[in-house]
Every structure is written in C-alpha cells, then in structure tokens.
Amino acid sequence: MGILTLLLGPALITVSGEQPGSTEKWTAPAAEARKKNPVAVSESSLAAGQKIYMKRCVACHGKTGNGDGPDAADLGIHPAKLSDGLIRGQTDGELFWKITVGKKPMPNYVSRLSPTDRWNVINYLRSLVRR
C-alpha cells in the first residue's frame, strides 16, 4: 500500500494546489508573489492571452475557466475553477510562478511559453473572473 501511495500521490494533487483532505496549499515563494505584471491589460494582450488559453488550457480548465474542459474527467482530479474567484486572491506574480513551474497534472510552461505569453494569459484569466 505504501508504494501505491507513493506512485499515485502526485496524481492526487489538484491544480489549485490543495491535496484532497489536506490543508496544504500550492504557494508561490514570497519573492515570486511580489512580481508585477509588466504587460498592461489591452485588447491585444487579452486577445493573445485568450488564443494561448484556448490552445494550452481549455482542454482541462474549460472555455470559461470552470474546470470542465473535455479532458478534465480523465485527470482523476478536478482542475481549478479559474472563473470562480480562485485567482482573485492571488497576485499576478503568484499566477506567473504557478504557470511557469506547473504542478502535476498541469505541465510547467517555463520553456513552452515566453514570459510575455504567460503574462498575457494572466491578463486573460483576470478577465474570466470579471465576467
């Protein structure tokens, strides 16, 4: 049973950073949390962020960020609901760090997206919460 737990444990971690039945949070380092988004919110930033989101994130997080994408059911956990205010309490720096480093089953995007692309995605995510 111990080996099975070790093998399956990482798969039980939710995208929001909590483990089922745990109070452990996925927390960005303080220095990362203080980072400011250098990309101003604009039509072009939102459009770029939406395009990336629809290509890279929608399969799990869903079109409106509700965690109901077509691949969500196959993950074994429920993807974070990005539209329900989960991100409202997090700084842009925290979100940037989480997108950059990832946490299974969410991949890291350190080499998949440029820093500007990651900031554009954050601007787009913020627009989902405002809807």
Description of each model-found segment:
Residues N66-G67, P115:
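Short, non-ligating residues that shape and space the ligands of small metal-coordination modules
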Residues P38-V39, T64, K81, P105-N108:
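Conserved beta-strand positions that form and line the central face of beta-propeller blades
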Residues T14-Q19:
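Boundary of Sec targeting at the N-terminus
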Residues G21-I52:
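Electrostatic cytochrome c docking/interface patches
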Residues W97-K104, V110-R131:
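C-terminal capping alpha-helices of c-type cytochrome domains
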Residues I77-E94, Y109-R118:
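Electron-transfer interface patches adjacent to heme c in soluble/periplasmic c-type cytochromes
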Residues E43-N66, A72, L95-V101:
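Sequence/structural segment immediately N-terminal to covalent heme-attachment motifs in c-type
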Residues G2-A11:
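Bacterial N-terminal signal peptides
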